[in-house]
């Protein structure tokens, strides 16, 4: 009992002790008593906390899981997702629904392209930009896990062809001139066709310089950054000059940053407007704020225009605003003269076609006493005021906003605000750098393109090198590089211009993708068809290389011709250009000049006369400067042959073939119906230049052949082959002229139909009129003096028989000389009147037959018979300022000719490699009539050619 009591007391005491402890301290169980629960497999499980996902997440990111909760059988397929289109508008209209109404490929996120050559896949992720040329998409390459920029060209032939030029130029620059990527030119990776669209793959770059200025709130960049970018741009321009390439569209939007490289670098992009320096094509190029004076004035241009644009870019980088923000070309030129204190030199103004649009002649180029003074120099020209321009153009010029308080370059640069809180020493240092910048800009923006600095000269300026600037920079002289061929310049006049220059049309979308047709601009064909230097509108003359149907009015045909001139250069046949290089046969795309004739060679003579009615009326917007008189075009009255100058090297007559007619008696002595040309050849190359190529070529323009030195020349058989066509009971005996080197004799064996039995029975006595391209450069006046009076009298009679222009049903013979002797004249000077009209004989539909007296050479041809010029627009590129080329503008639906309602017929629609129709628009096509051939004529028994000839359609 006592034990129980004692034990109870101990328990009570222990309980009281525990109770007192529990009050003062927390309870801590023994570790051995409580252990973590372990399942049978022996691994501890994590504690899961149930967190409910927001509704937004379950219905967006986890939408597929939500659907599977509702329906375990649900399967997701990405191709069924509604597409997020990147192209606007996104409604399929053309190209079997792949293209919209603008012929842009309809792009959507996650669309993929595939290159058939490289087997590379490109998945579209975003749209970087778009323009009238097409679109630029940001694409992901799964194989390399990288991004690239893919330019998708519009599904139209003009854009396609121009994009091929860009591909060719960039490939050449990357692989040949800059294989190590050190000259800041964008890299091209790949190009391929996708759904009939040409796609070009470039490296992906960052923002352009304009966006950089915009981010900086249009405040100028620091001089150190301006110097860094300028040095890199000069490296790119030096590479272009070394390659003989003109960018033609240099501006801040086309210079992109490459932020992946440190320090930051830039790269020049967008070579869609680029061309070779010796094969310039377009006259309306460059964005307006960065357009050079020679382009504004319509003067022949070189790589110097890129240096002008570069100067404008450097000024804009420093100022934050464009230096010449003109609202129109007149406004830009006015600002240039005002800010720079100079004007273009007189030799440029004298030759430029747009001079009368912006300047007035206040003196004579030979007597500058009455002229104005600009920059301390006398000038025969003075810039028009706004009122004078309005009076001439019948509209007010658009004037842009004035951003600067000062009107000259030095004050604009000096007065630009300095950076806030800039130390005094830095202000003095920057002031000296600004003086160097002013001198640098003056050298880049020199009105005289011959004096404008080259990239190599500009790279040595103290502003670029960092040397102290103490005096105006005098660049080291450079040996000018003179190109062999004469520049070809095509105006954007309403008739053809931009598109027809390269054989293109913005309306032709249904074409098999073939290389660009053979032209001086893109000599890619293995063969060529000749034309004549003597016809108006033909630009493929002696040294240009004869080309396929390269009549300026048709580009691919033989019948469509526009009488249009622009001021590429003096239109003489053999003269000295500014570089001192003879240009045998210059482009007729030159300013028309009213020539001054001696007595007897007026409008009734054979020379060109503005009253002759043989030129089409001026198109709207054409400058009258094309028709200003010229003081150095004078025909010498005397010549041994009494038919005007006997050699094209002695006169300039727009390529008239009649300047050599005085040599007929000597040529006629050596020619007959059976003349083969082999035995009389002065050079063995003549035998190679005859026969084969001419045998399958039946062209007008005098049946001229091609040079043996032409890039696309074919080896020809010896001998001149004649072929006879019988139509309506009349035998037509035709011949073919050949061209050989300058050391060879150029002759013609072209014979003309005649209604007299004398010619049929005795063809040896029939006069063979030499072709305009068959002038013999080795022929001298001494040979003419050897002729007796009997030969001269027979020459006059025979020559008169060859002065008829006739046209038979065969359009290929439409430009022949008929041998009807009824038009002979006793006055030889009257036999030069309509020489240029050879180029117009095909414009007429339904020309009279060859024996029609009204079709003779001396007959007056009304001006209404020629086609007036029609407006022609060009496409535009991304960011391009002027309404032109790739920024440009917008193909028209069609062009209507004023005479006989002549419509341009497009080539037949073809299918691409994918079998899809290339041309979705409804247009009228012709399969049987090549360009230039009249639709009411037919040429039977056309000889087959060894190389397939491309018929481009008809402008009938």
UniProtKB/Swiss-Prot annotation:
Induction details = Induced by drought stress.
Compositional bias (Low complexity):
672-691, 818-830, 913-924
Supply the enzyme class, top level. transferase
Q: Is the keyword NADP assigned to this protein?
A: no
Q: Which GO terms describe its cellular component?
A: plasmodesma
Q: How is it modified after translation?
A: Autophosphorylated at Ser-222.
Sites of Phosphoserine modification: 222
> Per its record, what are the GO molecular function terms?
ATP binding; protein serine kinase activity; protein serine/threonine kinase activity; protein serine/threonine/tyrosine kinase activity; protein tyrosine kinase activity
* Residues covered by the Protein kinase domain: 122-464
Q: Where is this region: Disordered?
A: 620-657, 672-781, 806-956
| Compositional bias of kind Polar residues | 622-636, 697-713, 725-757, 806-817, 838-849, 870-884, 902-912, 937-947
Q: Which InterPro entries match?
A: Kinase-like_dom_sf, Prot_kinase_dom, Protein_kinase_ATP_BS, Ser/Thr_kinase_AS, Ser_Thr_dual-spec_kinase
Functionally, this protein is described as follows:
Dual specificity protein kinase that phosphorylates ANN1, ANN2 and CP29B at serine and threonine residues, and ANN1, ANN2 and ANN4 at tyrosine residues. May regulate the phosphorylation status of annexin proteins. Acts as a positive regulator in abscisic acid (ABA)-mediated regulation of postgermination growth and drought response. May regulate the expression of ABA-responsive genes such as RD22, RD29A, LTI65/RD29B and RAB18.
Q: Which family does it belong to?
A: Belongs to the protein kinase superfamily. Ser/Thr protein kinase family.
Its name, as the record gives it, is Dual specificity protein kinase YAK1 homolog
- Organism encoding this protein: Arabidopsis thaliana (Mouse-ear cress)
Please name the taxonomic classification of the source.
Eukaryota, Viridiplantae, Streptophyta, Embryophyta, Tracheophyta
The gene from which this protein is expressed is YAK1
């Amino acid at each position: 009992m006592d034990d129980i009591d004692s034990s109870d007391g101990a328990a009570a005491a222990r309980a009281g002790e525990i109770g007192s402890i529990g009050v003062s301290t927390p309870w801590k169980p023994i570790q051995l008593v409580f252990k973590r629960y372990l399942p049978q497999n022996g691994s501890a499980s994590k504690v899961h906390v149930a967190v409910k996902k927001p509704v937004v997440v379950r219905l967006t990111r986890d939408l597929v899981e939500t659907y599977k909760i509702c329906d375990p059988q649900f399967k997701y397929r990405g191709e069924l997702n509604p597409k997020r289109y990147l192209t606007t508008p996104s409604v399929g209209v053309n190209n079997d629904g792949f293209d919209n109404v603008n012929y842009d490929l309809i792009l959507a996120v996650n669309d993929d392209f595939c290159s058939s050559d490289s087997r590379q896949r490109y998945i579209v992720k975003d749209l970087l930009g778009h323009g009238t040329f097409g679109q630029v998409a940001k694409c992901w390459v799964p194989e390399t896990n990288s991004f690239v920029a893919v330019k998708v060209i519009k599904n139209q032939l003009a854009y396609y062809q121009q994009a091929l030029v860009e591909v060719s130029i960039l490939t050449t620059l990357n692989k040949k001139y800059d294989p190590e990527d050190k000259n800041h030119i964008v890299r091209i990776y790949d190009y391929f066709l996708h759904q009939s669209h040409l796609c070009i793959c470039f490296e992906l770059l960052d923002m352009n310089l304009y966006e950089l200025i915009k981010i900086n709130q249009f405040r100028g960049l620091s001089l150190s950054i301006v110097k860094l970018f300028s040095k890199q741009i000069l490296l790119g321009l030096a590479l272009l000059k070394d390659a003989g390439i003109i960018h033609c569209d240099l501006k801040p939007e086309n210079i992109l940053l490459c932020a992946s490289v440190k320090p930051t670098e830039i790269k020049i992009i967008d070579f869609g407007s680029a061309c070779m320096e010796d094969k310039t094509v377009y006259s309306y190029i460059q964005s307006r704020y960065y357009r050079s004076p020679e382009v504004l004035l319509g003067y022949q241009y070189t790589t110097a225009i890129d240096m002008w644009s570069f100067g404008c870019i450097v000024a804009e980088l420093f100022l934050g605003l464009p230096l010449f923000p003109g609202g129109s070309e007149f406004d830009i030129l006015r600002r240039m003269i005002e800010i720079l204190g100079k004007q273009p030199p007189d030799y440029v103004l004298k030759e430029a076609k747009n001079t009368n649009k912006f300047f007035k002649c206040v003196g004579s180029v030979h007597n500058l006493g009455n002229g104005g003074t600009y920059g301390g120099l006398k000038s025969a020209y003075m810039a028009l005021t706004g009122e004078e321009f309005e009076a001439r153009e019948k509209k007010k010029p658009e004037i842009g906003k004035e951003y600067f308080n000062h009107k000259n370059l030095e004050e604009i640069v000096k007065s630009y605000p300095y950076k806030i809180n800039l130390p005094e020493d830095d202000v003095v240092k920057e002031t000296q750098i600004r003086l160097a910048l002013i001198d640098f800009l003056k050298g880049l923006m020199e009105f005289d393109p011959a004096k404008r600095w080259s990239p190599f000269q500009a790279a040595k300026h103290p502003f670029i090198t960092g040397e102290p600037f103490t005096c105006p920079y005098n660049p080291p002289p450079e040996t000018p590089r003179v190109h062999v061929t004469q520049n070809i310049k095509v105006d954007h006049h309403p008739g053809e211009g931009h598109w027809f220059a390269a054989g293109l049309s913005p309306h032709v979308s249904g074409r098999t993708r073939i290389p660009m047709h053979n032209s001086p601009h893109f000599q890619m064909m293995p063969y060529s068809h000749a034309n004549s230097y003597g016809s108006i509108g033909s630009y493929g003359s002696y040294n240009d290389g004869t080309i396929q149907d390269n009549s300026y009015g048709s580009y691919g045909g033989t019948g469509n011709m526009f009488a249009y001139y622009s001021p590429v250069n003096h239109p003489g046949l053999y003269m000295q250009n500014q570089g001192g290089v003879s240009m045998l046969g210059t482009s007729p795309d030159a300013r028309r000049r009213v020539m001054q004739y001696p007595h007897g060679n007026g409008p009734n003579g054979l020379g060109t006369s503005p009253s002759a009615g043989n030129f089409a009326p001026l198109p709207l917007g054409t400058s009258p400067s094309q028709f200003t008189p010229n003081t150095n075009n004078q025909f010498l009255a005397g010549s041994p042959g009494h038919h005007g100058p006997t050699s094209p090297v002695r006169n300039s007559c727009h390529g008239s073939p009649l300047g050599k007619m005085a040599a007929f008696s000597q040529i006629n002595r050596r020619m007959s119906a059976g003349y083969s040309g082999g035995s009389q050849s002065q050079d063995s190359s003549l035998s190679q230049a005859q026969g084969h190529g001419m045998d399958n070529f039946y062209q007008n323009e005098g049946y001229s052949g091609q040079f043996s030195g032409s890039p696309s020349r074919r080896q020809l058989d010896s001998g001149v082959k004649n072929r006879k066509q019988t139509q309506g009971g009349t035998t037509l005996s035709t011949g073919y002229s050949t061209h050989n080197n300058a050391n060879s004799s150029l002759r013609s064996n072209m014979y003309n139909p005649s209604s007299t039995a004398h010619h049929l029975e005795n063809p040896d006595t029939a006069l063979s009129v030499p072709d305009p391209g068959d002038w013999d450069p080795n022929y001298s006046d001494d040979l003419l003096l050897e002729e007796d009076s009997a030969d001269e009298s027979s020459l006059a009679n025979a020559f008169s028989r060859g002065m008829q222009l006739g046209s038979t049903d065969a359009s290929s013979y439409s430009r022949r000389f008929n041998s009807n002797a009824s038009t002979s004249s006793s006055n030889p000077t009257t036999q030069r009147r309509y020489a240029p009209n050879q180029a117009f004989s095909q414009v007429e539909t339904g020309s009279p037959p060859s024996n029609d007296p009204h079709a003779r050479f001396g007959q007056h041809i009304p001006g209404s018979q020629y086609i007036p010029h029609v407006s022609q627009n060009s496409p535009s590129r991304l960011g391009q300022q002027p309404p032109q080329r790739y920024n440009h503008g917008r193909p028209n639906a069609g062009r209507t000719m004023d005479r006989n309602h002549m419509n341009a017929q497009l080539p037949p629609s073809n299918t691409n490699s994918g079998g899809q129709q290339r041309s979705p628009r409804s247009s009228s096509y012709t399969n049987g009539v090549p360009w230039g051939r009249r639709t009411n004529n037919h040429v039977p028994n056309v000889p087959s050619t060894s190389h397939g000839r491309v018929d481009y359609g008809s402008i009938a």
